């Protein structure tokens, strides 16, 4: 099994840092659902301002708030206004790689979604990997395995 990117919140801005909370990162459920990030799921966080890299788990904040709050020890690594990348992952067999389409959301400075992208890996006629980034289809969540669900 290989660890593969499942979804990303790319360039989201930290809205608060709460050192006295028990830990985690608090995120808007709308962003999580669209990127396929689950509550209590462990995520990697990469701070574009400082280069800090940490791992923590997700808790859900207020829907529609566009929040991104680092809690507990994680609050020491990211400050309000920092731009970060949040990534979840899955373990799959290499043969399943062409079957997934990780969802990537990009953000403006107010944490509104700017773009919805999908990472795509296919094999060419010679069995070599080919990677592409495409605008996402109209999905209600990231497709981890099998066909994505289409929003009616």
From Swiss-Prot:
Primary location class: cytoplasm
Source superkingdom: Bacteria
Cofactor or coenzyme needed: pyruvate
Modifications made to the protein after synthesis: Is synthesized initially as an inactive proenzyme, which is activated by self-cleavage at a specific serine bond to produce a beta-subunit with a hydroxyl group at its C-terminus and an alpha-subunit with a pyruvoyl group at its N-terminus.
Localization annotation: Cytoplasm
Entry EC no(s): 4.1.1.11
One Pfam family named in its UniProt record: Asp_decarbox
Cofactor: how bound: Binds 1 pyruvoyl group covalently per subunit.
GO-annotated cellular components: cytosol
Biological process terms in GO annotation: alanine biosynthetic process; pantothenate biosynthetic process
Pyruvic acid (Ser) PTM positions: 24
Positions contributing to substrate binding: 56, 72-74
Keyword Magnesium found: no
GO molecular function: aspartate 1-decarboxylase activity
Subunit relationships: Heterooctamer of four alpha and four beta subunits.
HAMAP family xref list: PanD
Function: Catalyzes the pyruvoyl-dependent decarboxylation of aspartate to produce beta-alanine.
Family: Belongs to the PanD family.
Official protein name in the record: Aspartate 1-decarboxylase
Organism classification: Bacteria, Pseudomonadati, Pseudomonadota, Alphaproteobacteria, Hyphomicrobiales
Name of the gene encoding the protein in the UniProt record: panD
């Amino acid at each position: 099994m290989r660890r593969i990117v499942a979804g990303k919140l790319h360039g989201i801005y930290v809205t608060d840092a709460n050192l006295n909370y028990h830990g985690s990162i608090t995120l808007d459920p709308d962003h999580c659902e669209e990127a396929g990030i689950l509550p209590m799921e462990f995520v990697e966080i990469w701070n574009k301002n400082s280069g800090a890299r940490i791992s923590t788990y997700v808790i859900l904040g207020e829907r529609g708030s566009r929040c991104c709050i680092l809690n507990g020890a994680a609050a020491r690594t990211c400050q309000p206004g920092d731009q970060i990348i949040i990534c979840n992952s899955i373990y799959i067999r290499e043969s399943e790689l062409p079957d997934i389409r990780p969802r990537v959301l990009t953000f403006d400075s107010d944490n509104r979604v700017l773009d919805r992208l999908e990472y795509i890996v296919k094999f060419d006629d010679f069995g070599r990997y080919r990677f592409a980034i495409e605008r996402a289809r109209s999905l209600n969540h990231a497709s981890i395995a099998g066909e994505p669900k289409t929003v009616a």
